[in-house]
From Swiss-Prot:
One of its GO terms (molecular function) is magnesium ion binding. HAMAP family: HisG_Long. It comes from Xylella fastidiosa (strain 9a5c). It is found in: Cytoplasm. One of its GO terms (biological process) is L-histidine biosynthetic process. Its EC number is 2.4.2.17. It catalyses: 1-(5-phospho-beta-D-ribosyl)-ATP + diphosphate = 5-phospho-alpha-D-ribose 1-diphosphate + ATP. Signal peptide: none annotated. Feedback inhibited by histidine. This is ATP phosphoribosyltransferase. Catalyzes the condensation of ATP and 5-phosphoribose 1-diphosphate to form N'-(5'-phosphoribosyl)-ATP (PR-ATP). Has a crucial role in the pathway because the rate of histidine biosynthesis seems to be controlled primarily by regulation of HisG enzymatic activity. One of its GO terms (cellular component) is cytoplasm. Keywords: Amino-acid biosynthesis, ATP-binding, Cytoplasm, Glycosyltransferase, Histidine biosynthesis, Magnesium, Metal-binding, Nucleotide-binding, Transferase.
Length: 304
């Protein structure tokens, strides 16, 4: 074991992720891409960092904000919906919110929506007055209802929210929607979006000042290098000087063109980072505009 890995236990960085769920595998892939690896404990809830002194806790997603607030974990990967729900609940109870969103991670996207039975003739939010709304996000929903001056009854459920109207325990629901297939299966239709959500990296507002500070800065830098390159590719080609303006016009989502030293062919060697999809049709447009020898290269990581 290297000296850098053998730090005192609480000088090791701790990251909490969902033990089992839709965010688990994307979170592990992201952290692995950041250069982290672990040795898993027998109970499979704690993973000891081997490549770096960064340990992993596998927990319920709704436990992650609390673990960060208590200082048990330094970071957590959790849905913004869960983070905001617990923050809203803490504020309503007069408690401080000691954590913050450090990075949006661009996976686990969904929306918190109000959904009503398909037979409803939906017109506007005035129809919510006096209605019973089933949800697992009572604090977020309460804030939204108060903002819009709507008096409605909240029916708090821990799961299976979508079945509440059919059981007669609620008139409509407020729940997470990804594809909408679950709503359709229960004869519900979305009518109002409360918030957009995605997986986020959360951490304490007051950052650690010991050995963990350097680890945190390094991890964030690596993560930024990965997130910045998401859906990005390195485009390389040759072109004559007089064609560069037209080629630049065809690359609105690219960084400024970089001209490489002349290789003696009479054409310029050019490269740029494109932050969008490069389709075959797009390559053919560039070729017609004067680009030669086009190559698209995948870039896995970068340090700015």
């Amino acid at each position: 074991m290297s000296a850098s890995t053998a730090l005192p236990v609480r000088d090791r960085l701790r990251i909490a992720i969902q033990k089992s769920g839709r965010l688990t595998e994307p979170a592990r892939r992201l952290l692995t891409a950041c250069g982290l690896s672990w040795r898993q404990s027998r109970d499979k809830l704690f993973c000891y960092g081997e490549s770096l002194p960064v340990d992993l806790l596998l927990v319920r997603d709704d436990d992650i904000p609390g673990l960060i607030a208590q200082g048990v974990c330094d970071l957590g990967i959790v849905g913004r919906n869960e983070l905001d729900e617990q923050a809203a609940s803490r504020r309503r109870n007069g408690l401080p919110v000691p954590y913050q969103t450090l990075r949006g991670l661009h996976f686990g996207q969904c929306r918190l929506m109000l959904a009503v039975p398909e037979e409803w003739e939906w017109q506007d939010i005035s129809q919510l007055t006096g209605k019973r709304i089933a949800t697992s996000y009572p604090a977020i929903l309460t804030d939204w209802l108060q903002t819009h001056h709507i008096a409605a009854q909240i029916v708090e459920l821990s799961g299976s929210v979508e079945i509440a109207p059919r059981l007669g325990t609620a008139d409509l629901i407020c729940d997470l929607v990804s594809s909408g297939a679950t709503l359709a299966a229960h004869q519900l239709k979305p009518v109002i979006q409360i918030m957009e959500s995605q997986a986020v990296l959360a951490g304490m507002i007051r950052q650690p000042a010991d050995a963990r500070a350097g680890l945190l800065a390094m991890l964030l830098r690596r993560m930024d290098g990965l997130l910045t390159l998401r859906d990005s590719n390195l485009l390389m080609f040759r072109a004559f000087q007089e064609h560069l303006d037209a080629l630049t016009h065809l690359l609105p989502d690219a960084d400024p063109l970089v001209q490489l030293p002349d290789d003696g062919s009479g054409t310029l060697r050019v490269q740029t980072m494109c932050h969008g999809t490069i389709t075959w049709q797009r390559l053919e447009e560039l070729e017609r505009a004067g680009a030669q020898g086009l190559m698209v290269l995948t870039v896995e990581r970068s340090l700015a």
